[in-house]
């Protein structure tokens, strides 16, 4: 079936569901709760587990004081925590600012200065470069959260 043929059908629950990233993860957790969502090395997370972890991150950010429109930056490789940030940060109402792990500390500092990040999430493996970047930023009130990629919670 081509897209043109598909588009001729009236939109109904059976053939159409508008999806934003947040409604996508919520729907996936309901429809496919036990199906794998993330496979990372030996670790595997179902859609339900990913959704639950995403809610925990959003809740933690909100309790910390992050509000709609605030910026949360993250310096991380493609890990499960990065996936959680892609859903959890917008779920809290904040804007996610992902920073390329190949950048030098001066450039990371520049990005942090111009993003006005309130929180900076950093993979522990990248902490030395992040520490150098933090020394260059004007906003000394930024909260830095370090995590390990193999953390279970």
Q: What residue ranges belong to the model's regions?
A:
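Flexible, non-catalytic linker and terminal segments flanking ANL/adenylate-forming cores
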Residues: 1-18
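Short, flexible active-site loop motifs that bind/organize anionic cofactors or intermediates
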Residues: 11-15, 40, 47, 98, ...
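Conserved AMP-binding/adenylate-forming core of the ANL superfamily
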Residues: 16-17, 22, 26, 34-79, ...
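Residues within well-formed alpha-helices
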Residues: 27, 53, 72, 84-88, ...
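Conserved adenylation A10 loop of the ANL superfamily
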Residues: 33, 148, 152
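Structural core segment of the AMP-binding/adenylate-forming
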Residues: 63-64, 91-149
């Amino acid at each position: 079936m081509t897209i043109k043929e598909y588009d001729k059908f009236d939109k109904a629950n059976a053939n159409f569901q508008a999806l934003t990233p947040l409604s996508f993860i919520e729907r996936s957790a309901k429809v496919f709760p036990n199906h794998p969502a993330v496979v990372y090395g030996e670790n595997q997370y179902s859609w339900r587990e990913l959704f639950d972890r995403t809610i925990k991150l959003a809740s933690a950010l909100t309790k910390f004081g992050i509000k709609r429109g605030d910026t949360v930056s993250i310096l991380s490789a493609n890990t499960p925590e990065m996936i959680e940030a892609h859903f959890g940060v917008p779920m809290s109402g904040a804007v996610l600012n992902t920073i390329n792990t190949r950048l030098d500390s001066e450039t990371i500092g520049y990005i942090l200065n111009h993003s006005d990040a309130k929180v900076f999430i950093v993979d522990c493996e990248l902490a030395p470069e992040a520490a150098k970047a933090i020394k260059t930023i004007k906003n000394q009130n930024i909260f830095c959260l370090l995590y390990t990629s193999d953390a279970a919670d």
